[in-house]
Amino acid sequence: MDLASLPPALKPIIPYLKQSQQLEKHDLLMAYYCRVHAIQMAMDIKQKMGASGSFLSIPIVKILDQGDADKAKLGSRLDEEDEAKYVEAFAMKAFSFADTQDRAGKANKATSTTFYSAFLFFNVLEHMGEVSEEVKLKKKYASWRSVDINTAIKNGVAPSPPPSIDQNEEGGASGETEEDAQLKQLEMELNLAKATLQQDNNNNNNMSSSTIITTNSVSEGMSSSLSFPSFPSIPNNNNNNNNTTPSFPSFPSFPSPTNSDNNSNNNKPAFPSFPSFPSPPTTTNSDSAPSFPKFPSTPSPTNSSSNNSQQPSFPSFPSFTSPTNSNNNNNNSQQPSFPTFPNSTNQKRQVFESDEEEEQEEVEDYSEKQQQKSTSSSFPKFPSNSHNNEYNQPPPPAYEFKQSPPQQHKQSPPQQHHNSHDNEALIKYQQQVAQQNLTIQKQKHQNQMLQDEVEQKQQQIQLQQQQLQQQQQQIQLLQKQIQQQQKQLMSGGGGGGNMSMNLNHTPSDTDKASAEKYSKWVISSLQFDDVPSAVKNAKLSLKYLTGEDS
């Protein structure tokens, strides 16, 4: 029986059941008595619990069944009259074994366990009837010594030696046994222990009363009889005998704040003065207002000639005189001289002038574009001079540039460079788009292939299902045929169909065994969907039963 499965309410009987299990192989009779004692304890527990203890019936019945089995094994060895003597002798034997080992100084954990087993055996003995004082004393001693040895082992300390027995002080008749002497010695030691405990209690009471009396007497005559050390007194200013009193360190004295003497300021402690901050300026006084830095004012375009010195100087450009000047001599001297072309026919001159006009238009277009770009970017503008209109002069007439046409101004517009970069970016973008389209087409193709594979697999699964259905139908037909044939065989009638039966054939035992074997093979073949093998085995089975081939 598994003791761990017992309910908690039956925990007190577990030690006795353990002893019973340990003694089954060595002493079945003592194991039986321990189990009977456990059953009696369980019945008492159930009776005390009343209706709530009904769940204990099942484990109690199991213990009873095991006790009945032991009782059947014992048979005539059970003797109700001598059972108490047997249990007492067994308990005394266990007690003496543990006590001998203990007094020899060999106490260990097994010694503690043996003392505890003897204690349990003494409990079994007490429930069988009245016991002697010797049994009661040994029961108590076994319980105490078991706990004492176990506690010492747990604490890592050597067990204390057992109480000694003085053989010279043993009294009584000469026929007194050694165990009786030990019990008397134990009684004497117990009495001595009680006496010492009582004496200690009396001494404690006397000590408490004496302390109360002494405290009262001390409180009454403290000044006369006892002298306690006094705390040092504060020195008196008028006392001239300073040597008798203890001196304490003097703290620095601070002058009183109400002293009217001007000279006392010298004795005061000097504290650091805080720096004085200037007072903020008043709003009424305009001169004391904070001054801010003045930035230089920009010259106005209508400034007089006297302010020209303050204006920023810019690099001077070559000045051209206006063509409308009244002084013809000065104009001839100031204007640049250009080489004159030789006179030619009017037809050649018109062709050349038309070419010059086209080139001039190209130059003007390019200059306009450059001006638009320059106006879009932020560059400093030069100040306009309203007095001298030299920079606003009209361009010279076209006939003055006939000799050297401004071919050097022909430049390819910078937009072509940007257009080339844009074209490269567009080409790259188109290539990326083409690659993406290719990858998308590949993915579509792969998806289509996967879909085709899935459809093919689905078709294969459908075909397999159809084949399975056909096989199942064939199996059902075969099973029906077999059942019909078995019915015909059982009824003793002739075989139907193409089967020929010999009614006079009586199968032997070997034929029956072979037929049974092949019929089992029919069932196993049908389980694995092997229809041909099932048909073959069925025919062989019928052959052994009927004696003829089908």
Curated annotation (Swiss-Prot):
Q: Polar residues bias located where?
A: 340-349, 429-450
- Compartments (UniProt record): Cytoplasm; Endosome membrane
Q: List the GO cellular component terms.
A: endosome membrane; multivesicular body
List compositional bias (Acidic residues) regions by residue number: 353-365
PANTHER family, A to Z: VACUOLAR PROTEIN SORTING-ASSOCIATED PROTEIN VTA1 HOMOLOG
InterPro entries from the entry?
Answer: Vta1-like (IPR044538), Vta1/CALS_N (IPR039431), Vta1/CALS_N_sf (IPR023175), Vta1_C (IPR041212)
Major location (coarse) = cytoplasm
Q: Where is this region: Disordered?
A: 153-179, 220-460, 488-512
Specify the protein name. Answer: Vacuolar protein sorting-associated protein VTA1 homolog
Regarding the membrane, this protein is recorded as: Peripheral membrane protein
Q: Locations of Low complexity compositional bias?
A: 220-274, 282-338, 372-389, 402-417
- What is one GO biological process annotated to this record? late endosome to vacuole transport via multivesicular body sorting pathway
- Its gene is vta1
Q: What does this protein do?
A: Involved in the endosomal multivesicular bodies (MVB) pathway. MVBs contain intraluminal vesicles (ILVs) that are generated by invagination and scission from the limiting membrane of the endosome and are delivered to lysosomes enabling degradation of membrane proteins. Thought to be a cofactor of VPS4, which catalyzes the disassembly of membrane-associated ESCRT-III.
Domain of life of the source: Eukaryota
Alphabetically sorted, this entry's keywords are: Cytoplasm, Endosome, Membrane, Protein transport, Transport
Q: Which family does it belong to?
A: Belongs to the VTA1 family.
